[in-house]
Amino acid sequence: MAEITAKLVKELRDKTSAGMMDCKKALIENKGDMDKSIEWLRQKGIASAEKKSGRVAAEGAVGSYIHTGSRVGVLLELNCETDFVARGDLFQGLLRDLSMQVAACPSVEYVSVDQIPESIANKEKEIEMGRDDLSGKPDQIKAKIVEGRIGKRLKEMALLEQPFIKDSSINVEELVKQVAGKIGENIRVRRFTRYILGEGIEVQGPDFAEEVASMTLG
């Protein structure tokens, strides 16, 4: 029997998008054989999300999450293929987890990197190109550094790229694929909106001189 190493588990996970524990169990059950482990996961419905990705997901639900203190709220639309699945516990649990994820990640503004407008990417590039630590560097080196920084920044803005708040060993995209595999339907995060109490409202603070005067008189 082949040794079930972390590298082997990661390789299976990369090929199937299944969870780490599922991959480890599959490898143990199949004595480390990669092909048999992939087939085992497919039979269990864990590694089948990719095959379903081309099917239309027009059903689903809009979920909400209000954070403790009622200062942050999220609305998120999650799509699937049938109304039956949309009403199920797995789908509803995913909907709530994703809504919580958006509430916990204030820098996230888009579902995926692909949705980020080119104008935003260009603006980020402009900002990075102007940073002091790049001055004097050759253009080729500067371009590589900027490309890496922009890629990281754009990922920070995309929901699917975020580490899952309940299990940082996977990201949100992998979580969606895992649930899709278990459910047996294509699942797609379509859009979300975050509301922050008081956002955009200019609060007029007390006049400092008047505050000092009142304290002195008191």
Swiss-Prot record:
Disulfide bonds: none annotated. SUPFAM superfamilies: Elongation factor Ts (EF-Ts), dimerisation domain (SSF54713), UBA-like (SSF46934). Residues 82-85 are annotated as: Involved in Mg(2+) ion dislocation from EF-Tu. It comes from the Bacteria. One of its GO terms (cellular component) is cytoplasm. Keywords: Cytoplasm, Elongation factor, Protein biosynthesis. Its main location: cytoplasm. GO terms for molecular function: translation elongation factor activity. It is found in: Cytoplasm. CDD domains: UBA_EF-Ts. Pfam families: EF_TS. PANTHER family: ELONGATION FACTOR TS, POLYPROTEIN OF EF-TS, CHLOROPLASTIC. Belongs to the EF-Ts family. Associates with the EF-Tu.GDP complex and induces the exchange of GDP to GTP. It remains bound to the aminoacyl-tRNA.EF-Tu.GTP complex up to the GTP hydrolysis stage on the ribosome. This is Elongation factor Ts. It comes from Prochlorococcus marinus (strain NATL1A).
